[in-house]
């Protein structure tokens, strides 16, 4: 082995040592982070304020704390849960969404177990929530045990009186409801007759005007009437 090979090996070892030393955090800082992780092992996601507080206690940057928690949730947290007698694979640690989300939800739990607020039925639609699943034509049951929403029959939903009431409400609530209050359209045949009569009157008027104009051009101009002046004799003077 030559001296150059030895130099390269020493350089690699020195780089490896620097990398290892760069990744190691102070023991006091690690202890503070581990204590916080154990206290919040069911929801190990510190908030921004808690990250700043831990940064001041451990003299570490916020980025270092975030990276430490990412690795700790994969390596340290499963052992902590096993010591409590719980299987980490059956738990999904949820992010903190508020004070009510400090408890982890089991992975096998169904979202239908959560309380869902159902809005009050409106006057437009009527929905009935039933706990019994709907059956298909072949009698097969749906796989999902979610509560089914069944619409009422069309006869119960839409009646002539209810339709008129809905139209009246929609017309009264619309800001442009007055624009649609137009008289009913006339039948097409009546429109056609009126248009034909009007067109005939226009044609007659035009023809009459042309005849009068032609008659004026053909008639000669009337002669001018000259009244003779009275003759006065000289003897009368």
From Swiss-Prot:
- The main location class comes to nucleus
Region annotation Repressive function: where it falls in the sequence: 103-237
Query: What Pfam families would the database entry show?
Result: Homeobox_KN
PTM characteristics: The C-terminal part is phosphorylated in response to EGF signaling by the Ras/MAPK pathway.
Task: Note the SUPFAM superfamilies from the entry.
Answer: Homeodomain-like (SSF46689)
The record's section on Gene3D superfamilies has: Homeodomain-like
User: Tell me, what does this protein do in biology?
Assistant: Transcriptional repressor, which probably repress transcription by binding directly the 5'-CTGTCAA-3' DNA sequence or by interacting with TGF-beta activated SMAD proteins. Probably represses transcription via the recruitment of histone deacetylase proteins.
Name the UniProt record assigns to this protein: Homeobox protein TGIF2
Q: Which organism is it from?
A: Mus musculus (Mouse)
């Amino acid at each position: 082995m030559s001296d150059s090979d030895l130099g390269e090996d020493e350089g690699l070892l020195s780089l490896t040592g620097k990398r290892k030393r760069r990744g190691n955090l102070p023991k006091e800082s690690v202890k503070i982070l581990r204590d916080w992780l154990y206290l919040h092992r069911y929801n190990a996601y510190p908030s921004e304020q808690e990250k700043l507080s831990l940064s001041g206690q451990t003299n570490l940057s916020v980025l270092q704390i975030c990276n430490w928690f990412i690795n700790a949730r994969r390596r340290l947290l499963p052992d902590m849960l096993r010591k409590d007698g719980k299987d980490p694979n059956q738990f999904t640690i949820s992010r903190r969404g508020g004070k009510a989300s400090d408890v982890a939800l089991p992975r096998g739990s169904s979202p239908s177990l959560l309380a869902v607020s159902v809005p009050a039925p409106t006057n437009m639609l009527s929905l009935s929530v039933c706990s019994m699943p709907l059956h298909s034509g072949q009698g097969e049951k749906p796989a999902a045990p979610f509560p089914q929403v069944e619409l009422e029959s069309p006869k119960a939903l839409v009646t002539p009186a209810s339709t008129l009431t809905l139209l009246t409400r929609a017309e009264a609530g619309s800001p442009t409801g007055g624009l649609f209050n137009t008289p009913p359209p006339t039948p097409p045949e009546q429109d056609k007759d009126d248009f034909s009569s009007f067109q005939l009157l226009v044609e007659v008027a035009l023809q009459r005007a042309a005849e009068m104009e032609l008659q004026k051009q053909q008639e000669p101009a009337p002669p001018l009437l000259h009244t003779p002046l009275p003759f006065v004799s000289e003897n009368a003077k």
